[in-house]
Amino acid sequence: MASSSGNDDDLTIPRAAINKMIKETLPNVRVANDARELVVNCCTEFIHLISSEANEICNKSEKKTISPEHVIQALESLGFGSYISEVKEVLQECKTVALKRRKASSRLENLGIPEEELLRQQQELFAKARQQQAELAQQEWLQMQQAAQQAQLAAASASASNQAGSSQDEDDEDDI
């Protein structure tokens, strides 16, 4: 294992990533903190081992950038050939995701509409939305006003009928 220097702390995998991986892999198992630390150290050492071997392969092929093929060759030469098919699948998935991101970011560029025009159109849409919202609020206010007027009229007619009924009772008392 590599010696523990101050720089090694900077080169470890984030513990949150390891914790997430452990929970996804072993959801019903409790893992002690020292076991988690051991997993972090093993992952870090594995990455150092693979990257060093990939770097040597890269240098032998007189390249300056480590490519996925160099990493795959490193896995093979270190005896991890059984992982290569899965690594290739993950590599393909990563390429697909990256391609989708590039396509999504270039959609705006492919529209052929200047940014100023897009901003103007956006402002128009915002203005229309504000106008529609104001109209809806106005309609709701008018409906509330009509409901209040109807309630007042109903209360007034109920009050008038109550007063008419009570004055008739008084007339009936006078007749007695």
UniProtKB/Swiss-Prot annotation:
GO terms for biological process: negative regulation of transcription by RNA polymerase II; regulation of cell cycle; regulation of cell division; regulation of embryonic development; RNA polymerase II preinitiation complex assembly. GO terms for molecular function: DNA binding; protein heterodimerization activity; RNA polymerase II general transcription initiation factor activity; TBP-class protein binding. Signal peptide: none annotated. Residues 152-176 are annotated as: Disordered. CDD domains: HFD_Dr1. Keywords: DNA-binding, Nucleus, Phosphoprotein, Repressor, Transcription, Transcription regulation. The keyword rRNA-binding does not apply. Residues 12-75 form the Histone-fold domain. Residues 152-167 have a biased composition (Low complexity). A motif (Nuclear localization signal) lies at residues 100-103. InterPro entries: CBFA_NFYB_domain (IPR003958), Histone-fold (IPR009072), Ncb2 (IPR042225). GO terms for cellular component: ATAC complex; negative cofactor 2 complex; nucleoplasm; RNA polymerase II transcription regulator complex. It is found in: Nucleus. Belongs to the NC2 beta/DR1 family. Heterodimer with DRAP1. The association of the DR1/DRAP1 heterodimer with TBP results in a functional repression of both activated and basal transcription of class II genes. This interaction precludes the formation of a transcription-competent complex by inhibiting the association of TFIIA and/or TFIIB with TBP. Can bind to DNA on its own. PANTHER family: PROTEIN DR1 (PTHR46138:SF1). This is Protein Dr1. It comes from Gallus gallus (Chicken). The gene is DR1.
